C-alpha cells in the first residue's frame, strides 16, 4: 500500500499512521508532510523503525527550504516517480 502524508506530522494522528503500516508499504511525504523528513525529529525516528521505504517529494522540500536538512534515510523523488509509485500500488491511504 502507498501511504501519502500531506499534512505536518504534528497535525496528524501519526500514531495511527504507524499502526497501519505493514512490511512492504511505502510512504510518500509531500506538501507539509515533508517536515517529517528533517533529520533529528521524533517522527523520523519512528519512520526509521518501520518496515517501509520513505520518500519525499523533492519539489516540496525545495519549496520549504529543507534541502540539506533531510535524513539520508529519506529518498527524494520527483513527480514522475510519484506517478510510478501510484501505479505500483493498487491501494493508497492519504493522511
From Swiss-Prot:
Keywords recorded for this protein, A-Z: Cytoplasm, tRNA processing
GO cellular component assignments: sulfurtransferase complex
Pfam families, A to Z: DsrH
One BP annotation, GO: tRNA wobble position uridine thiolation
InterPro entries in alphabetical order: DsrEFH-like, Sulphur_relay_TusB, Sulphur_relay_TusB/DsrH
Domain of life of the native organism: Bacteria
Subcellular location: Cytoplasm
Subunit details: Heterohexamer, formed by a dimer of trimers. The hexameric TusBCD complex contains 2 copies each of TusB, TusC and TusD. The TusBCD complex interacts with TusE.
Alphabetized HAMAP family for the sequence: Thiourid_synth_B
Function description: Part of a sulfur-relay system required for 2-thiolation of 5-methylaminomethyl-2-thiouridine (mnm(5)s(2)U) at tRNA wobble positions.
Family: Belongs to the DsrH/TusB family.
Name of this protein: Protein TusB
Organism expressing this protein natively: Shigella dysenteriae serotype 1 (strain Sd197)
Amino acid at each position: 500500500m502507498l501511504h501519502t502524508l500531506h499534512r505536518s506530522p504534528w497535525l496528524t494522528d501519526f500514531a495511527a499512521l504507524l499502526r497501519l503500516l505493514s512490511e512492504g508499504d511505502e510512504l510518500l511525504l509531500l506538501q507539509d508532510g515533508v517536515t517529517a523528513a528533517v533529520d533529528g525529529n521524533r517522527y523520523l525516528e519512528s519512520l526509521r523503525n518501520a518496515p517501509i521505504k520513505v520518500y519525499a517529494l523533492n519539489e516540496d522540500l525545495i519549496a520549504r527550504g529543507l534541502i540539506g536538512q533531510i535524513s539520508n534515510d529519506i529518498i527524494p523523488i520527483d513527480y514522475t516517480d510519484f506517478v510510478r509509485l501510484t501505479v505500483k500500488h493498487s491501494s493508497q491511504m492519504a493522511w
